[in-house]
Each structure stands twice: as structure tokens, then as C-alpha cells.
Amino acid sequence: MEDSHELDLTYVTERIIAVSFPASCSEESYLHSLQEVTRMLKCKHGDNYLVLNLSEKRYDLTKLNPKIMDVGWPELHAPPLDKMCTICKAQESWLNNDPQHVVVIHCRGGKGRIGVVISSYMHFTNVSASADQALDRFAMKKFYDDKISALMEPSQKRYVQFLSGLLSGAMKMNTSPLFLHFVIMHGVPSFDTGGACRPFLKLYQAMQPVYTSGIYNVGSENPSRIRIAIEPAQLLKGDIMVKCYHKKFRSATRDVIFRLQFHTGAVQGYGLLFGKEELDSACKDDRFPDYGKIELVFSATPEKIQGSEHLYSDQGVTVDYNTADPLIRWDSYENMSADGEVLHTQGPVDGSLYAKVRKKSASDTGIPSSPQGMPATSSPDHGDHTLSVSSDSGHSTASARTDKTEERLTPGARRGLSPQEKAELDQLLSGFGLEDSASSHKDMTDMRSKYSGTRHVVPAQVHVNGDAALKDRETDILDDEMPHHDLHSVDSLGTLSSSEGPQSTHLGPFTCLKSSQNSLLSDGFGNGVAEDHNGVLSPDLGLGVDTLYDRERMCGGREQKPLQPLLRKPSAPTPVQAYGQSNYSTQTWVRQQQMVAAHQYSFASDGEARLGSRSTVDNTGLAQPPPHIPVTPNRGASSRVAVQRGISNGPNPPDTQQLCPGKALQPRFQDDRVTNGVHQEPNTGSSPGSPTLDIDQSIEQLNRLILELDPTFEPIPTHLNALGISAVCPDGVGSGLRCSGRLDSVDGPGRSPGRQGDDPIGGRLRKLSIGQYDNDAASQVTFSKCGWGKAGVDPAPSLGSFSSPEDIKETVITAYPSDLNMIDGRIPNSKESSMCLTPSFPVSPETPYVKTSPRYPPFSPPEPQLSSPASLHKGREPRGCPEIISHTVGMSESPVGPKPTMLRADMPATPNFQQVFASSCTVSSNGPGQRRESPPSAERQWVESSPKSTLTLLGNSHPSESPLGTHEFCSSGKDSPGLPCFQSSELQASFHSHELSMSEPQGALPPAGSQTFLGFNTVTTATSVLPPGEDAGTLLVNSHGTSPAPGTPLLTTGAADNGFLPHNFLTVSPGASSHHSPGLQNQNVSLPGQPPLPEKKRASEGDRSLGSVSPSSSGFSSPHSGSTMSIPFPNVLPDFCKPSEVASPLPDSPNDKLVIVKFVQDTSKFWYKADISREQAIAMLKDKAPGSFIVRDSHSFRGAYGLAMKVATPPPSVLHLNKKAGDLSNELVRHFLIECTPKGVRLKGCSNEPYFGSLTALVCQHSITPLALPCKLLIPERDPLEEIAENSPQTAANSAAELLKQGAACNVWYLNSVEMESLTGHQAVQKALSMTLVQEPPPVSTVVHFKVSAQGITLTDNQRKLFFRRHYPVSSVIFCALDPQDRKWIKDGPSSKVFGFVARKQGSATDNVCHLFAEHDPEQPASAIVNFVSKVMIGSPKKI
């Protein structure tokens, strides 16, 4: 049958068609037959067929067929386990979308690949077996038995059996580390005359060579077995192939003795035994003895197995270690892609120009990326890296389902599973899980690799059983970033896990030699995935059939139908979705510069205001996926805890940070009924449910197992995560965007637990079907807008109840940005992330050693268009870019306190209003003259969640790209004479409270021109000038100007009697009155960017303290916690205990006396440097004026702070001891200890020093009067680091040292290394390049990872074509420069600049070697690398 020269088209079932072409048929015959088949399919099925191409990718096949998935793998081989799941999922998804859909399985060559797909899908559909599918399964079984089974290879059958066992639950996954020590051949094949054999082994992991043995020469005595020792032992994980060759005697050819493929998850114990019938190639080769067997011996550690010394030597067998022979090194799988496509699953692409080895530049699609870290072939003596993913991360999960999804059936939807089927699936899913990795997904017709999901570059290194060939290699070192790597992505010896799938304790026909295995997952399966990839929910299939099919499933129709909205009707008990924007961090060149971070969260109550995610097309920025996504627990924590957390809606997983490529096809969303982030609910209900849901869950769980083994694995998306529409990055933002987000599910009292959503806004970029975009003219970038909308009226909402006092936590309101790109919805450009520990080289300026603070010109926001929550459903939306800043954790069920109401906060609708709360959000509220469209009985509610309550700052942010400037808040009120106006560019507030709420009369309308801003009703006019006698702000006055209802807690902040703070930062006028509420007894207002502080006291309580809070438990954040500007608040709260204030009502109109609010710039970012040392503080201050100071974290006293200040003259004791005048400069910097006590912070050892509520208060007071200090403090107006960098070359050198300590890395082309004798300088680079250009044959070039650190330059061959790793210490690197003649190097694209560095030849004191490189990424020029090496690495030791 295989030798037939005609095509074979078979209807396996009515909807599954198998089309095969023999490999021997001519190209002309193939094309002719292909055209006939295409015409027949189009005539009979129209465009309702999907082609699964199991062979190599072909342009003509793509051209003739509208929908095609290239999922091929090498002929006669087994596919990776994840690819089998991908194909099954694609079939199931396509066939369930439309009854008219059919699947065409295309294969040119051996039909064994068709057999793999048919049999896998047969087992796959058996998971949710139904009577109507029984006939199809029978037809597939008959086709398999009659036509295909005999044509399949043993490894193909082994993989099908393994998948069947996993799906049925008959097999368990083994995640124990497996180190291969021996491959023993029982029975010697007879390949040469006289029965001789010269075998050698090659080990492949994810189709990448990881080990090559020496050549074993079997003597004439012909021993009964050959023991091939694997030295060092190889850690194998995932899809493994062992291929044994025979090297012909006196011939440059080799024959395959046997080939076997298996998955490490199926290995039980530490031994495998394969008979001849289980070996590919050997099963049909008469030269392999019938009694022959192959035995694999594993262990859990790389150390030699005790008692196995006799296995290392065989009499009559000699080993040739000449593995430099090209025949031995040749990888037959290296050039499987004829068109030069990437032969691996692309790793995370963060747009970073200098991604680490395990990443890949977004601009280069032809160069495979490589895993980062030490390869498995490293010497086993690195004991600190011998723990594998499974053994050190604790990823054992309870046998519980991690996804609790609610799906509502619509008329016409497929029936759900029966309870019995549900129980079976529960059993199946007890250990499976899926969490999408950040692998970039391929387009259906434009995949980067025809072996997607199977090709992970695992650097190949030829290892021999000895010390040969070491003279050709330079030092192999461990990457100094290894300790910082998440071991979830690096195996026990540093090898990045390749494409691996589930593991089992049973391997089908394998004969297990040992079963004494300590399973790490005895009660479940690993469910973690690659680090920082949590929730990158990309609905495509990893191979292109993404939104086209999933959208049809969601909508129950074709792609022309709109997306199914993701928010259910109010009547459906839906878990609350909370939305969070990024928590980003920016590494700066100077280590002392503070990181800027911001958290933005929001939540909506069930039946009340709901937060949605806008999916309509907008020009303003980044797309954000809808929040209706099930969460799977993160890696990093105990998986058992994570599973329980996922089921019980406990604490949410930590924020994840995901990377987003710079350019992309931009999807078109057609849901025109979505406005301002609130999805309108149609009458059709929610997404249809079907057995697909359960299979989706099964595949999710199965893929989680694969990801447990291989963090780089590209999972198979399912319907569950298809709802999470991936975001795309705007073209103009740049390639360094990092986007992440978070969905927090908050359960209030009486609300049924639901699933948590974790939905990064920046998810992995997806390329959608070209056919889906043929009518997309606009091709605009989407931006998700968030807003509040009334989803319904709950007459008796069971939402709010105050927490008990002991549940009080701190919630930080972070209003940033330092990079004001957030104004238009973009994420600040950050090339460094938690995933990229080594930053890229600085480009512009070429080598900045001190990063200056950004300066932002002021701007005035336009007049916002405000809309009520109900109006959001009617298509109205605010003009501003809404970004909700809040942080919700959970609802306390304490039954105390009144029903909370909404705290409204709107920016004044005046063009001249100076916006302070940067990047704040527009909340839907009643604008002037607008009616509330919600029923009169509805009460606008916004509830502060306890125990971690939140005040949300809601304002209007400008959609333009102009950054936010400094703004002034000046009051014309008569109650604030003499108080100055201060500037503030970024404000941050932190509140301790039970409940911050504000009542609003039903149906109330705000007066024209007034808007509530942070609870202060600010009356504005066209010119922002108030009439005489009016104050600028009102404290806690609702939009109608009426007082809150009795018993409603009030937000009142200020300083009543603050003797130490004459300049009150937030002043409440003495005449302001407020209601007293017990719920506010423990409310605290403080600076979030301050050290741990105690609770503050009321003015009327004297010295009585409401309670002491230790620094470690108070919840206060220190100044370096991420904010650069803060709102300083006094250390004494308004006195609520005075009867006069309790009795006096709030003013009823803006004409009454109002509260005056003053803001002042927080300068803590200038004087608080947490991580600097005592010596660095001295260096910063010794040339400053007396009174200059720095506050830092004390290194000697944990939890305390050190105050270093410059004084005019040193103390007399110092003058007496130090007679030398030269020593006095350092003695002029004096050091004081600031201790943290339950009462506050104070200078230690000074009896006349009072306690202060914050560091800011202490500093401010001492800037007014010195108290116990030698002189008053001078509050700086700019960062002293910048000043020193400008004035002192020594500090620049220190900054360079810090920069070098941080290191920089990139990928470059390695061209050649040329010996230069003693020549150095530009001449050496010029001569080396000239010699390279004329060299015949030209030297082989390859992509290497080029890392510069304090240790020197480290080169890692991404594919190990030329070497593994080379290290050049700092002391050996002499010179680095561009080619003086500016010659370019051309390699499959635009020309690149050439640079090189000169280093001492190893073992020589005079000879030099020039190493040449070329730019790999044009956006990262060679000049940046040269500058870094020359000025930072080579230059810094000379300066310091």
C-alpha cells in the first residue's frame, strides 16, 4: 500500500477524511492529484473543511486550501505528546463548531502519521463518550485496524497508548528526575562482516541533540552485550529519542541500528526494557538479533550508581572518542525545514532587544532561540543545581479540579454530560491542568515552524567518556544568573525543559525493571507552568485555528456573528471579577534609583456596578482581554495550596508579568454592543455548554502536566481560555512593552464561590487567520476600557459589612506614572522585567550610567464627558482613558455596620482643572444636567472591601501622549491663610479604614459645575475661580450637596493639633464638621511610601494609643516600595470625639464653610535611598552643604533607618582624635539611627526627640528646627545621584560598577576568532575581519548569547554548532571596538555592523585572539555593545 503511486482518499467517518500521497510519487503527479482533491472538497463541502497537514509545510497546499493547519513531524517518528493533544483539540473544536464542518487529514509519505492522528482522536473522543459518537469511533477503529495499524512504527503506537492511558486515567504521571546513565544493548547486531559492530548513540530531547557517545568497537569475540555509558549522566525530561548508529568501517557512512522514542512521564522506576518488536528500524532489520533488547538505566541523581562499576567496562570493547568526526556530529534532524523556518517552538518574546538565550528576538523569525542555563551535559559536580523542576518546586497538587466554570446551555446547544460522565471526567481531571505559556502562537497560514511545539533548541554538546578535545574548548561556566532563575524553567543542571508532555508511571508495553519510585505526585499532578506566564490566555490552538473557530463556538455560528458577551445577566450568580492593570518594574542603570510600581484594581458587586473589558476597536492603546477567565494556580507556591485556592476563591495568585511583542496583526472585534468596558447582555444567555467544555478542561489539565515538565511548551488552547482575547501591542509603542494584569475575584457575604480570573492585559500576541481578516480595513489596535455600569438592581444587596477592628489592613492607592505613557493606555516601556534578569545594552544614550528622573510638561485635560452607570449600556463613554486604581482583596463577613454606599470620585469637568492624580480613572457618575437612568430605588454603591479596604481614586486621564506635569492645588479659602501652594507630579495615598462610604439620595442630581473629587466636592467655574467667601473643596459632600445619612462612616483626614507639623500637608479647617462613626475609630491616613509605622492617635486621646503595630506587621510600605511621589499626611488624625463636631451637621451648600485641602510635593525619593551603604552615603554628602542628608535602611539594625547628614564642623571628640586635616571631609558626615517603635519613629538616643508618625514627618520637622540634630535638615530639590553623576567622575565610575554588576546580554552573530599574536587595538579588529573575509571556506557563523558582567564576557552558542560556552574573564579582555573600515556583514537579510574584542589567548601572557561578531538585531546596534564593554567593563576597574 505504501508503494502505490496513487493518492488514497478515504472517508474514515462522514466528517473525517484521510488523504495520503505516497512519498515516491513525482511532484507533478502530487500537484495534479492535490488539485483534484481540492476541487472535490470545495464542490462537496465548500469552505467547511479544515486541512490538517501532517507532512512538511507546502506553499501550494496552503494556496489551494482556505483553512490549513501545519502540524507535521518527521516521517516514521512519533509526534510530541503536546502536538497530539493539539491536533485532537483542533479536530474537536472544528467539528463541534458547525455540523457541516469536516476535517481532512493530509499526509505525504508514510501513513503511520495518519494512524497516530486517527487513533489519538478516537481515544480523545472516548473521554466524553456519547451514543451518537459510537458509530464514528467504531469507524475510526475499523479504519485503524484494517489500513493503518500495520504501517505504524512501534514508537508511534507507544505514544498513542500513552495518550490513551492519560485520558482514561489508567496511567499516572511521573515527574521524578530521571538521569540516564547507561544504554545497554543485549545482543550485538551484525552490521559488518564477521559479526562486528561499531555503534554510537545520539540522545535527542524535543528533537534536539543533547548527547553523542563515543564509537564502541565490538571485537571478534563478540560479547553478548554492549554497555554504553552516558557520562555525565543526562537529565531527560519530556519527549526523548534514542538513536543508535553503526559507523561503517573505512567508510564515511553510517547505518541506523535502532531508534526508540518515549516520554519520561511514562517511566516507572529507573529502568526501561525494549524488545526488538518495540524498536523502530530494528523491528524490521534482520541484522538485529531477534532476542536483542535495549535497556535504559536511570537514577534520580547525576552521581554514579553505586555498585555499577562493572557496567563501565566490557572486555573486547574499545571506545573511540574521536567525536569531532563530522559523521558523528552530524544531526540528521538539523535541516528538516527546507524553507529555513524555525524548527522550534518560539519562546517568550518580550520585545527586549537583548533577550536571554531562552528568548528570541521578535524581529528575527529565522534564528532559533535557545534555552538559558546550564545544559544537561554539564559536569554533575554542580550540586546546587541538581534538583529538577519536579523535585524542588513542590508541584504536587491535590486531586481536585482547579477550574470551576459555569456555563449556561442555550437552545440548540449540545447536551451536557451525564453525571456519570462528569464523574469520569472528574477522575480524569483530578491531576490534569493547563496554564498557557508565553510561547508565541502561529498563524494558521503563516506558522513559523512546521514542527511547532516540538522544536526547542537544546544546545548540543558532544560528550565523550574521557577528557579528549578539551584543548579546543574554553572554560565552560555556569551562567551567573542561574541562582536567580526560576527553577521551573531550568532543570536540575540548568537545561531548559524541552517540549515535554505528561508523564506516567506506566509506559504501555514497556517492561519496568524497577518500581521503587518516590512519586512526587502520588496524590495528583503538577499543575504549574512556566514562570510569569500565568493567565496568558490565548484562545488559539497554538497553530492557527484560534479565534476563527473559538469565536464560532462562542457564538454558535460563523465568524460574522459578534462575540458572545462575557458578563452574564444579573440574575446569574456570577463571581465578581476584579480587574487589575500592570504591576510593572523598571530596572535602572543606577542601582540606587527607586523602582516605580503601581497596582490598579477594581471590583464590582453582583447585581450592581460591573466592570467589563472593552473589546471594540479603539485607537488609544493596548487591548485588554475580557475578565471572564478561569484561573489556574501560579507556579512558585505549593500546588496543593494553589488548587485549594483556585476552588475556594481564596487569596489570588500573585501578579504575573507578560511580555508583548512590538508588532502584530491586529484582530478585529465585531461586538458593537460593548461600551466603555461593560458588555451588554443579549437575550441569548451565556456561551453554550457542551461536552466540549469537559474535554476542554481535560486538555487544560493535560497540558498543565506537559507544562510541568516543559515551561516552554506551547499549550493547546481551549474554549475555556478562548474567552480571553489576547491583547496586541500598538505598533508605535516599541518592542520593549511589558504588559500584565490581574483579575481578583471578590466574594461578598452570601455570594456563592466562583472561579477566579487571572487575565493579563498584555497576553501573548496572536496572529489570527488571514481569511478572517480579508475585510479588515481599519486594522486598528484595540484598547480595553474599564468603567462602571449598572448591571441591574439588587433590592437587598448582601454586599457590605464592616470588618472587625482586628481585620484592618492597609490599602495603598498608587497614582503614578513615572513614565506617563499610561495616559493613553499604554504600558510604560520596560525592557527589563522579572523574566529578564539580564538587561539589554543601553542604546540611547549609548552608555548612560545615571538615569535622570523624567520631567513632564504640564497639560490640561479636556472637558470630560461624564455618563451615569446606566448610560454606559447605551453607548456613552467618557473621553478620558479610564484606569481604575484600587486594590481589592476580599469581603469580610463581619455582621457589623450599616450597608455601605458608593464613594463617588469624579474630576471636575473644567478644562483648567489641574489634574493631580496621574493616570486615574473616570468613574461613571452624573454629569451636570444628566439624568440617572437607573430606577429610583437603585442606590449607587461602591463598597470598600475588608479586611484590606480600598479607596479608589477616580478621575479623568488624558488620552494623549503628553505626560502629566506638575500641578498646583491652591486654595482661596479664608481658613488657610499663609499656607503655600506646593507642586506635585505624582501622588499616593494610603488609608486604614473599615469602610469608606458615602451615601447618595436616591435620584439625586449634582449641581451644575460640581463634581466629587476624592470625596471632596469641588465647585468649579469656567475659570476655576471661586466667588468670594467660597472655599475650594468640600470634605465628604455628595454630588447634591446634602449631608450623608446618619451612621454612614465618613472619610476625614487632616491634622487638628500637630505641634511638629506647622506646614500641614493635608489640612482640614477647624470649622469643618463631620459625623462620628464607630467604623472610623481605627481609620489611619498615612504616607504609603514610609517605613513601618504604628497606628496614629486621635488628638483628644492625649498619649493614649489605639494600639501598637510592629514594623513587620503594620502593613506600611517603605519609601522604596515603588512610589516616587506621595501624599504626606500628618501623624494626628482629626478628633472625632468632640461633641461639638458630632452635633454639627455638614454644610448643605457650597456657600458654607468648606474644608481646605493642601498638597505638597513629596521629596522622599530624593532623600530616601534604601539600599546604599554607609560609604556611599558619605561619598554623596561630603561635598554638599551643611544640612544635606540621606536616609537609608540600616544594615546594622534590622528594621531601623540610618540618617546621614553633613555638618559644618565635626564634633570636638572627632577633632581631638583626628589631627589630619585630610581626614575631616569624611568626618563631616555624621550618622544617626532612626528607630521604629510602637509609638512611631524617632532619633535613637536623644531624650529631647519626640516620636513621629512617619519618616516624612520627622524629616519635615527637623527641616524647621534641628531639635537634637547639629543643624536643620536641607530638603533636597533634586536627586543627589544626578548631581553627583554630573559633577563627579568618581560617582560615574561607581554607577558603572553598579551597572556592570547588573550586567547586560544580547544575541549576536559569532563570525570568527583569529589569533593576533601580540597585536591589539583597532588594528587587531581590522586585520581579523580582513582575514575572515578572505578565508576559504568561509568560517561557519552562528547566533550566540553575548553576556557582559562583572566576571567578564560569556558566549553561549545557542545551537551548540561551534561550541557550548566560552568565558573570557575581565582581566583577559583588552580591547573592544567596531571595525575601523565600517565593513558590513550580510547574512540572509540586511547588512550588519561588525565589532570585535581582543582577549588574551588562554594559557599565554602575550598572544591575543580577536573575536568577531555582527549585529543580530538592528535595533540593538553594535555600538551599544562596544560602549558597554569598553566603558563599563574594561573602563570601570581603572576608574574605581
UniProtKB/Swiss-Prot annotation:
It comes from Mus musculus. It is found in: Cell junction, Focal adhesion; Cell projection, Podosome. Interacts with EGFR; EGF promotes the interaction with EGFR. Interacts with PTK2/FAK1 and BCAR1. Tyrosine phosphorylation is critical for these interactions. Interacts with Rho GTPase-activating protein DLC1 and with the regulatory p85 subunit of the PI3K kinase complex; in resting cells, interacts (via C2 tensin-type domain) with DLC1 but, following growth factor stimulation, TNS3 is phosphorylated which leads to weakened interaction with DLC1 and enhanced interaction (via C2 tensin-type domain) with p85 while DLC1 interaction with PTEN increases. One of its GO terms (molecular function) is phosphoprotein phosphatase activity. Residues 1305-1439 form the PTB domain. Residues 1-170 form the Phosphatase tensin-type domain. It is an enzyme of class 3 (hydrolase). This is Tensin-3. Residues 358-421, 607-662, 675-694, 740-762, 846-881, 887-906, 920-975, 1067-1123 are annotated as: Disordered. The keyword Phosphoprotein applies. Belongs to the PTEN phosphatase protein family. May act as a protein phosphatase and/or a lipid phosphatase. Involved in the dissociation of the integrin-tensin-actin complex. EGF activates TNS4 and down-regulates TNS3 which results in capping the tail of ITGB1. Increases DOCK5 guanine nucleotide exchange activity towards Rac and plays a role in osteoclast podosome organization. Enhances RHOA activation in the presence of DLC1. One of its GO terms (biological process) is positive regulation of cell population proliferation. Disruption phenotype: Mice display growth retardation and incomplete development of small intestine, lung, and bone. Postnatal lethality is detected in one third of the homozygous mutants. Keywords: Cell junction, Cell projection, Hydrolase, Phosphoprotein, Protein phosphatase, SH2 domain. CDD domains: PTB_tensin, PTP_tensin-3, SH2_Tensin_like. Expressed in brain, heart, lung, liver, spleen, kidney, stomach, small intestine, skeletal muscle, skin, thymus, testis, uterus, placenta, aorta and trachea. The modification Phosphoserine is found at residues 332, 361, 370, 440, 516, 571, 648, 687, 690, 769, 804, 860, 894, 960, 1144, 1149, 1288, 1436. The gene is Tns3. Its EC number is 3.1.3.-.
